[in-house]
Amino acid sequence: PKMGRITEKGIHYINGIPLAESIFARDVLNPVEESDIRRLIAQQSAIPVSLNEKTEKGILLYDCRSDEEMDSPSKEIFRSNDTYKLIAGCAGLLEKIPLESTEKKKREVQLSDKLIVLSGSLNDVTIAQLAAAEKAGACCRHIPMEKVVRGAWSEEEMEEFIRSFSAKERRWLILDSLGSFKEEDIEVEDLSETISLTMGRLADQLREIEPDAAMMVIGGDTLQGVVKQLNIRTMEPEQELERGIVLSHYTNSHKEGYLISKSGAFGSEDLLIRIQRKIQGGF
């Protein structure tokens, strides 16, 4: 809600504009054409959805117009044992997790002062943020989309691409999917998955080449691809670096680390610059 995302009578709004009329409706990869969350879920699932009304089965959707309005349902959700099998929500919901529910001591976050950003978002907001970061000194490069969409970017070429950047460039490196390609080489519905899986492969190689660098992922589908490729089994949110920018600790079968995540369609133009300064300054 602090970022203008609210739900009223089941309708989701972005800064007062219905979701299907907002910037999300113009998203190249996943345009949203429905503002009613119940109908949006019904397009993908036959599971019944109830609004603000507790039921034994199905999906329970809560209206939320302010941070204060999150208090009551969040207390019920987090303090019930097995009533809720799966909880979904925005980053703001993390603030409502009761401290007593966390048994582990808070970790001391240690990240290097290098920041590598993987962006699979084609959103106008993200594009402006990448441009601002490049102007501020980031090394910003497109991945070779003409090869990516044809499945022709080999592991060897990917490693060569990564190693082509100097040590200085890798101190603040942004790799994005904004490069040009022939539209006839790929179906639009396959583009999102292709980008996310490619970014996942990049993340895997970057972890080997730059194991200590802080890694930031932009775009929900991109994050999914990274999680899949790194074989991440658990992700525990640690803190919000900025509103909606979450630092999470992850573990997989043989290592652990941190990921910074951000959805594509929000934040001011200087957001990446502020994140980089935080990384430079330490936690």
Predicted regions and their residues:
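Accessory terminal and edge-of-domain segments that mediate assembly/interaction
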Residues: 28, 35, 46, 50, ...
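Redox- and metal-dependent alpha/beta enzyme cores, enriched for Fe-S-associated oxidoreductases
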Residues: 108-195
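Cap/lid and interdomain-hinge subdomains that line or gate substrate/regulatory clefts
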Residues: 1-73, 79, 282-283
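Residue-level preference for the first positions of well-ordered beta-strands
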Residues: 58-61, 84-86, 114-116, 170-174, ...
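Active-site histidine-anchored catalytic micro-motif
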Residues: 1-20, 25-35, 212-213, 217-269
